[in-house]
Amino acid sequence: MKKILYMLSFVLLATSCDWLAITPENSIDEDDLFTTGYGFRNALNGVYLKIGSRDLYGENLSWGFLSAAAQEYLTDNSQQGQNSVQISKDAADFIYNSTSTQPVIQTIWETQYSVIANINKIIEHIDNIDKSEFAFGEDEKNLIKAEAYALRAMLHFDLLRLFAPAPATNPTGTYLPYREKFGPEIGEQLSVTA
């Protein structure tokens, strides 16, 4: 009897529970998102929101970490938020492997590639949809596509600027993966002069 009970329990646990799968209300399936111009506009707005976040140009790549690394201002240890002061001090002293600066640098790297992945999804799908799905026809479709390409180029350039040496140092060295497609593969690494 115990054997049957164990086997029955195993069968119940091993079966699929599709009725438990709930799609969150604040998410949308990729196939649904990229079927209308409205979906493409929403996806592009999501890219702009992420670019404007504190992790990128909302702080770290504008007045925050990057300004401290460029020594555009002096740090005052009497300020509130000692952790942010330590990050600024280490960045100004070019100490990029400290416990305060490493998480910021890693966040910049990961967030930029995450945004590039989202942009690549837009580029991947935009040619598969007819211009009639866009409120302003082909002009809007071309505008969204052009913005996506421009944003991807800007983000790759900033990654190169931040994480690769100057071209005069080693023009043929490869330092960063260049991502043109969405997916788990690393991507081709280009030289700084490519």
For each feature predicted by the language model, list its residue ranges:
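Short coil/linker segments at helix-helix boundaries
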Residues: G137-K141, F163-A194
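Bacterial Sec-dependent N-terminal signal peptides
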Residues: M1-N26
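Conserved, well-structured interaction surfaces
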Residues: S84-F163, L190-T193
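Secretory-pathway/luminal and periplasmic proteins that interact with or process carbohydrate-rich
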Residues: G52-G58, D76, L155-P165
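A structural signal for short, hydrophobic/glycine-enriched beta-strand patches
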Residues: F65-Q102, G183
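Generic structural "secondary-structure junction" signal
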Residues: I22-P24, E30, T35-T36, Y96-S98, ...
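Membrane-proximal, proline-rich intrinsically disordered regions
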Residues: C17-A68
